[in-house]
Amino acid sequence: MALTGSDIFKVIFAIILPPLGVFLERGCGADVIINILLCCLGYVPGIIHALYIILKY
């Protein structure tokens, strides 16, 4: 799937603040909660999860 203009901004948000990138892609749901927990456990797992969600959907 090709990246759109909005996806580029979501990826930038995912690197700076991963839950924000997930929220912009999927809305307020389980994915955001999972990402917040991953960010609390470690910043890198949160980034990986956010990039996965953005690039998958």
Curated annotation (Swiss-Prot):
Coiled coil: none annotated. The chain crosses the membrane at residues 33-53. GO terms for cellular component: cytoplasm; plasma membrane. InterPro entries: PMP3. It is a single-pass membrane protein. Keywords: Cell membrane, Membrane, Transmembrane, Transmembrane helix. It is found in: Cell membrane. Its main location: membrane. Belongs to the UPF0057 (PMP3) family. Plays a role in the regulation of membrane potential. Could mediate a proton leak. Regulated by the spc1-atf1 pathway and so expression is stress-induced. This is Plasma membrane proteolipid 3. It comes from Schizosaccharomyces pombe (strain 972 / ATCC 24843).
